[in-house]
Amino acid sequence: MDKKARARAAAAESARRTALRRAAMFTSPGVPRDLLASLPASARAFASGGLAAALSFAAPGGAGWGAPLAAELLDLTRTNMRAVYEAAPGWGGWRDGKKRGELLDSDARYFVARAAGGGGGGGDGGGGGGGGGDGGALLGFAGFRFVSEGERDVLYLYELQLAEAAQRKGLGKHLMALCEQAAREAGMQ
């Protein structure tokens, strides 16, 4: 195979992979695919260690997304990570604007965990925090994207954030398992 033929084959393969990734992410152009919809109902609930959570899917531009949810995700990330960013040499400290941009990226996808039954789930006992969604207080989320790394299409986990009251109860492990299932369903590695 000559150089031009190899380049054409590589371009065709790249286009095929991009189309597969887009099909995994969207039901139609600009409409994010609900990645929980194809999973068993048991995947949308969590109960362990005295913690009960209802899980939902959210993506910028999709159903269930709005400024209140985006603010909640940013608030939880800031609470958990600001000190780490400030202490890490070379990271440039915490910057709300930069993190907000990452969270709002059109390719970002989220599995969101909220206290089941509208209660605080062991947290502050309040409602939805910023009013960002149905149910109770935000307990945590997994933020991810479908990306290409070299010649492999993968689900890349950008954030796994849990409220203090939800830590060490298995919720993070459950969110990771959902990400793995979503990757398999989408044909990713």
Model-derived regions: residue spans:
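Short amphipathic alpha-helix that is part of the acyltransferase structural core
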Residues: G49, A53-W91
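Glycine-rich phosphate/pyrophosphate-binding loop shared by adenosine-nucleotide-utilizing enzymes
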Residues: A53, D134-F141, L155
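Active-site rim helix/loop that mediates acceptor-substrate recognition in acyltransferases
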Residues: A83-G117, G128-G131
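Short hydrophobic/aromatic beta-strand element in the GNAT-like acyltransferase core
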Residues: A108-V112, F141, V154
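A conserved beta-strand-loop-helix scaffold within acyl/acetyltransferase catalytic domains
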Residues: A115, A142-R152, L160
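A short, internal acetyl-CoA/4′-phosphopantetheine-binding micro-motif in the GNAT/acyltransferase core
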Residues: L157-R168
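Conserved acetyl-CoA-binding loop-helix of GNAT-fold acetyltransferases
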Residues: R168-Q181
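Conserved GNAT acetyl-CoA-binding A-motif
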Residues: A183-Q189
